[in-house]
Amino acid sequence: MTDRLEVMLEQGIRELELTIPADAQSKLLHYLHLIVKWNKRFNLSGITSIQEMVPLHLLDSLAVSPFIEGNQILDIGSGAGLPGIPLAVVNPDKNFVLLDSNGKKTRFLFQVKVALELENVEVVNSRVDEYFEKYQKEFSLITCRAFSSLTSIVKMSEKPLAVGTQLLAMKGVYPHQEIAELEMFNEANKATTSVYAVKRITELLVPGIESKRHLVLIGSER
């Protein structure tokens, strides 16, 4: 089984045109085994097949890696650690804060951090809005995957976005409705808040996944 997973991961990485060292690939597969081991206890993923996790969890997250800019990354609603853990594994020169309000999931994330020896990862158990109320840490980028609507994410992340942090949101089908809602939010609040514009939308082609994937970059215009 392990050999098959290694082949699946290696092939997917080649198709994504990424270069990932063998030791990092081993950590990625170790991470999947940890998800499988603790899934029932911590309710980490609706996907139970480790073979399906290779494209749906690992490759889906790794497809975002070329778009990670800056050195201080905040992954909100991190859940089982997606995309934060895979991105931290393949970007050891960047620092990642994995944020989730579910205590069980952050306990799992801490176990992953220790097991994979990820010195560039910090795990925080907090709601997003409460985190920004308490902490003054500056981030270059906020990431999220299947977390909430674009407008909701912007509202709860408005404090860092207003001072230059950018948001990179992983979505499925092209989010026409969510973009329209964000434009309505901007129009209604432009007199009192910053305007949060969609800077770029990239369609991602993820090996082993037939459904649509889009990456939405949002930043403040003032």
Feature-to-residue mapping (PLM):
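Conserved beta-strand/loop positions that form the S-adenosyl-L-methionine
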Residues: 76-78
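Class I SAM-dependent transferase core
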Residues: 2-70, 74, 104-107, 111-121
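Short conserved AdoMet
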Residues: 69, 91, 162
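S-adenosylmethionine
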Residues: 94-97, 101-222
